[in-house]
């Protein structure tokens, strides 16, 4: 980019000769950043970064969405089952569970595997025993469900009321449950998917009231070993951490501590990432390791989402009654956080390696899952979509927007004139980028540009002569020095 300072008064007899100066503006590889000082913005960041994915070398435009399946009613949950080479996906509405592994016609609703349910708000985990691998579901309104790769069954659980169990996780070769709207957890015998459940009450542990919301295993070394902790999280953000393998044994079960976090955004709003457990709260995406060594008043500074704190906290207030979800993809190298019931459908994206944030717009992400290396989301219109497939949102165009931080170009207080600019893009198809400049901290964006002409060619002997598009011959690019 060439920038020329505005002409200034010069001594008598001299003719001012302002010189244009080039200034490079590197790609915002550090992502969307709203928490910096306007006068000293963070380098290589952006004030707006919609429909981009941050990489270690630049940013890339996201892929489109593709209709995968129709469930008819709003999609409440998506979950997967995997055993050996077998991998299956399911989707749930408030009343039914549907198989989604193989879809013939995406416009035709498949036959439901499970019907007559009263809630689609499922918590789920997978558990292996000598009898096979099982997908375990709990929703706090219907009996617990197990899937073994061929059939859904209701396990015989005694001691607790199966329909009251609202969340599920595994720890130390046991299945644990949350009893909804209480401060009690229940656990089954070792290596069992059914049987007598034993209560583990936290009513004398939690001090802020509320109820137990979810539990999880926290692996400090990103694996499965002796350093694993069992974490119990309340609706008020209290976190009770235990270690051991048998909650019924005083010698083999010990409380590590009770810690305070901000309030979580749902029973599925957490994920294991490396050696930490990340929890989406009303303040930000908080590592549990920060909760055990940081005061609640200062924990915001330890949030993984600190660059977008103003946006995150505004959305958490507006969507406080919704159930956020967090998923990650090692292949795509990013994590996705849903924001259900958002009137402006969006989801948040963060690079797993660099922590750089961006936002996907136009996606009604009510629930999320990954299946066969592809992301999927369910929407309020009863449809399930594949994420980052193709170049349009089900035939509709979308715009990738990047607004950089405001720059003084090394001359604060001086007026500048933008003479010309050249973006550097690497692309496999023709695009129609629009380049504009904003001044004086005006973040108002112009209308999106028109789409580029279709650069695809016709199949030989498959189009009308002089009607189908011809080979655009744009594969080769001539490199030359840029001259102003």
Briefly describe each language-model feature range.
Residues 2-110, 115-134, 260-276, 282-484:
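Beta-sheet repeat architectures centered on beta-propellers
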Residues 91, 137-138, 146-148:
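Beta-strand-rich, repetitive solenoid scaffolds
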Residues 92-93, 139-140, 179-180, 234-235, ...:
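Structural signature of WD-repeat beta-propellers
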Residues 97-98, 143-144, 184-186, 239, ...:
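Structural signal for beta-propeller blades
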Residues 148-172:
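Asp-box/WD-like beta-propeller blade repeats and closely related beta-sheet repeat scaffolds
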Residues 168-226:
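Solenoidal tandem-repeat scaffolds enriched in leucines and small polar residues
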Residues 181, 226, 234, 341-344:
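Short, solvent-exposed loop/turn segments at conserved positions within beta-propeller repeat blades
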Residues 232-261:
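Surface-exposed extracellular loop regions of Gram-negative outer-membrane beta-barrel proteins
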């Amino acid at each position: 980019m060439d920038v020329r300072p505005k002409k200034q008064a010069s001594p008598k007899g001299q003719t001012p000769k302002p010189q244009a100066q080039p200034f490079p503006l590197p790609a915002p590889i550090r992502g969307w950043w709203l928490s910096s000082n306007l006068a000293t913005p963070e380098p290589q960041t952006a004030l707006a970064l919609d429909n981009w994915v941050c990489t270690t070398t630049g940013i890339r435009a996201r892929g489109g969405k593709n209709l995968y399946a129709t469930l008819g009613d709003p999609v409440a949950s998506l979950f997967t089952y995997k055993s050996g080479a077998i991998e299956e996906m399911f989707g749930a509405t408030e009343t039914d569970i549907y198989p989604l592994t193989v879809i013939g016609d995406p416009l035709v609703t498949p036959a439901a595997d499970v019907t007559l349910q009263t809630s689609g708000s499922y918590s789920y985990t997978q558990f292996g025993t000598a009898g096979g691998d099982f997908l375990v579901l709990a929703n706090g309104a219907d009996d617990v469900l197990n899937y073994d790769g061929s059939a859904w069954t209701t396990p015989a659980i005694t001691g607790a009321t199966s329909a009251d169990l609202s969340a599920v996780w595994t720890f130390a070769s046991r299945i644990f449950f949350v009893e909804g709207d209480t401060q009690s957890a229940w656990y089954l015998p070792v290596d069992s998917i059914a049987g007598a459940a034993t209560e583990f009450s936290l009513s004398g542990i939690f001090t802020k009231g509320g109820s137990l919301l979810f539990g999880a295993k926290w692996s400090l070394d990103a694996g499965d070993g002796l350093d694993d902790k069992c974490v119990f999280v309340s609706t008020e953000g209290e976190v009770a951490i235990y270690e051991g393998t048998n909650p019924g044994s005083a010698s083999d079960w010990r409380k590590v501590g009770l810690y305070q976090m901000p309030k979580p955004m749902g029973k599925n709003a957490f994920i294991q990432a490396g050696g930490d457990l990340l929890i989406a709260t009303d303040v930000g995406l908080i590592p549990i390791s920060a909760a055990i060594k940081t005061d609640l008043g200062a924990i915001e500074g330890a949030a993984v989402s600190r660059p977008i704190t103003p946006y995150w906290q505004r959305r958490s207030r507006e969507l406080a009654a919704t159930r956020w979800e967090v998923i990650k993809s090692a292949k795509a190298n990013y994590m996705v956080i849903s924001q259900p019931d958002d009137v402006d459908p969006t989801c948040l994206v963060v690079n797993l390696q660099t922590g750089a944030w961006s936002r996907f717009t136009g996606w009604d992400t009510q629930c999320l899952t990954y299946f066969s290396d592809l992301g999927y989301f369910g929407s309020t219109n009863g449809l399930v979509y594949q994420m980052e497939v193709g170049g349009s949102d089900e035939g509709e165009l979308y715009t990738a927007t990047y607004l950089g931080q405001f720059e003084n170009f090394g001359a604060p207080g001086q007026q500048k004139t933008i003479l010309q600019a050249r973006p550097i893009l690497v692309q496999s198809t023709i695009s129609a980028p629009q380049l504009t400049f904003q001044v004086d901290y005006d973040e108002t964006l112009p209308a999106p540009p028109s789409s580029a002409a279709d650069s695809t060619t016709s199949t030989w002997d498959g189009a009308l002569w002089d009607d189908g598009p011809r080979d655009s011959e744009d594969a080769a690019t001539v490199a030359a020095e840029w001259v102003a």
